[in-house]
Amino acid sequence: MSEPIIISCALTGAADSAGANPAVPVTPEEIANEAIAANKAGAAIVHIHVRNPETGKASMDPKLYKEVVDRIRDAGAPVIINLTTGPGARFVPELDNPSQAAATTVMKTAEERVAHVVENKPDICSLDVATMNFGDRPMVNAPDMLNKMATLIQDAGVKPELEVFDTGHVRLANHMVETGVIKDDKPLYQLCLGIPWGAPATAEMMMAMRDMLPANANWASFGISRFEFPMVASAVLLGGHCRVGLEDNLYISRGELASGNAQLVSRAKEIIESMGSEVANEKQAREILGL
């Protein structure tokens, strides 16, 4: 029998999407409740960003992360917690003076970007091994920054999830594994597909990136927007795990907004089981990932 498939649920993200679907959770209570609901629907992992409760905009406030994590743990939910470290990597140059950062730039130190991880000690945290045009904004993660973040994360006892958005990012992540920056005999990669202007969300691209990974790696993949569910099926076929959630896609079907993260997880579970595979529970997921 093939290995059970782990479903991860990305609950809210950092995009300006809270007004596009009322189901997008904003407050720590809403985010924690969505985590618990997604877990009950079949997600063994929840991937967490936080938002300013007043504005709905993305936030890096460690107090908000702590409240979300505490609420999930206090509820006794067995879900594996995965916190983001993505915010703090946006550099926008002034058009007339490119060496000068524009007002929309948000660049933080490694310590600032992982402070909530060190404090809350989740099971996993994402590490964006990527410098790219992320839509209309440059995302900058220099190798020295990534190395320092990886060290701080692992010193806190947390497993890095290496998020890669194109083939060059896979090469850098592999280099970090090969040189011992990532000290993990089961390194975890997330193949992020369909984001402008990274790798497209196709089965061919997923396969190409998968074939670049170390033999001992665990991997998952996701596609954004209308590619979310096709990429679930592709990941199952290609031997990986999958991710869904309102961070990546606001719709359950064409023109129909998802009622919540649990609905997206339930659909992913249906796809996995219809393909003859088993959905991993939290215990199985921990064993697979070496947590």
Question: Positions of the model-derived regions?
Answer:
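Active-site beta->alpha loop and helix N-cap motifs at the rims of alpha/beta catalytic domains
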Residues: 61-139
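Glycine-rich, proline-tolerant flexible connector loops at the mouths of alpha/beta enzymes
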Residues: 19, 44-68, 134, 192-193, ...
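Conserved, mostly hydrophobic/aromatic
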Residues: 31, 38, 49, 125, ...
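Catalytic alpha/beta core domains of metabolic enzymes, predominantly
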Residues: 124-247, 258
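Mid-to-C-terminal alpha-helical segments outside catalytic/metal-binding sites
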Residues: 266, 270-291
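N-terminal small/glycine-rich loop or linker at the start of catalytic domains
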Residues: 1-23, 87-96, 126-133
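Histidine-centered catalytic micro-motifs
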Residues: 9, 28-33, 43-55, 80-85
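Alpha-helix-loop-beta-strand connector modules within alpha/beta enzyme cores
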Residues: 9, 56-85, 148-155, 208-216, ...
